Amino acid sequence: MPDFFETELRVGEIVKAEIFRKAKKPAYKLWINFGKSLGIKTSSAQITSLYTTQMLVGKMVIAVTNLEPRQVGPFISEVLVLGVDGKRDGDIILITPEDEANIGNRVH
């Protein structure tokens, strides 16, 4: 695991979202476009209480992009999408750029 100052956060756009039926807890499989330098990366996210798959496609997100890939059941999660706890227990709210940001841009 890289140290804090080596953590790479980038803006991505969710281009595909599916229900992760084989996950132990309710989750989605996400495909996120990070532009030319990184391309499309995958992630598993337990965000089903506030989002549908239709709501997620086209959504801009912030993700950690330089972690080792992680096996989540039969799925490989390549990036970690960031979120914050919601008002209700178990709710996760995705962190998104306030204005349109360019896909692949680093977060400073």
Regions found by a protein language model. Name each.
Residues 1-108:
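Phosphate-backbone binding interfaces of nucleic-acid-interacting proteins
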